Amino acid sequence: MSKFLSQAAINTLRNTRLGSRQLVRSFAGISNTRNHRGAGHQEWGCGQSAERGLLELRMPVACRRSMFIQTQDTPNPESLKFLPGVDVLGKGNTYDFPHGTTAHSSPLAKLLFRVEGVKGVFFGADFITISKQEGAEWSLIKPEVFAVIMDFFASGLPVLNDAQPNADTEILEDDDETVMMIKELLDTRIRPTVQEDGGDIVFMGYEAGVVKLKMQGSCSSCPSSIVTLKNGVQNMLQFYIPEVESVEQVFDEADRMIDSEFERFEKNLKTLKQQGPSGGGPH
């Protein structure tokens, strides 16, 4: 019976056109009531992105058109969302490049990683999220990112070569009913809200009542990512799918190893800079 109600509720969600934050407030309040935690509501999502900047950049004369690139703050101070005014991957599609070593499948990502201070690149439907290294200044990074984006879209090259965007919520033949409902809810209501803040949530698996998710883009290192998962995503999934007991964030072991190597490299580089030209070389 619970599964029938869950599917019916999801069908209702499909046909309901509520603002994402309004929907979140409703579900957070319902979840609190259901769990007998008292009145009130909790907001979820990576946060609210309010500030926008607009810069007009002129294309080369041969292109005979202008590109307007907007920037949008994210809840993560280390990440910034760039909106070029054209499709990047198209509706609902995302692709994450957490490190420069993962950019081999995208000419655009390769160019963006050449900008000093860029740590991560994330592509969405119509936006690009840039995550910077700690201590790097946006005032120095932004002009170079603007130039790279402008030149790239003027070139007509494909954003991705052979790689395919995320397809983690695609319904598979061997998915049971619970997994299908989890994917449906993630795809229709949760991911669009997170993507508004320059990130994404990827379904990694479901086992013994535990939903495993991976945060990407601005959400991967966002201080509020755990709050997003527990107070937002978990509450919503539990309300519509009683079989869900908890939500856990997972990390790729390869990403951890690359992070460790990158931090070691940065530390060595800072040491060399502090030593200066006279530090150890022949005079």
Curated annotation (Swiss-Prot):
Instruction: Report the subcellular localization.
Output: Mitochondrion
Sequence segments annotated as region (NifU): 182-250
Pfam families linked: Nfu_N, NifU
Q: Which sites bind [4Fe-4S] cluster?
A: C219, C222
* SMART domains assigned to the protein according to its UniProt record, in alphabetical order: Nfu_N (SM00932)
Q: Name one GO biological process term.
A: iron-sulfur cluster assembly
Q: Where is the transit peptide?
A: 1-65
**Would you name any one GO CC term?**
mitochondrion
Output the InterPro entries linked to this UniProt entry. FSCA_dom_sf (IPR034904), Nfu/NifU_N (IPR014824), Nfu/NifU_N_sf (IPR036498), NIF_FeS_clus_asmbl_NifU_C (IPR001075), RNA-helicase_DEAD-box_CS (IPR000629)
Asked if the keyword Cytoplasm belongs to this entry, the reply reads no
Q: Name one GO molecular function term.
A: iron ion binding
Chief place where the protein resides: mitochondrion
The text of the family note is: Belongs to the NifU family.
Write the protein's name.
NFU1 iron-sulfur cluster scaffold homolog, mitochondrial
Q: Which organism is it from?
A: Drosophila simulans (Fruit fly)
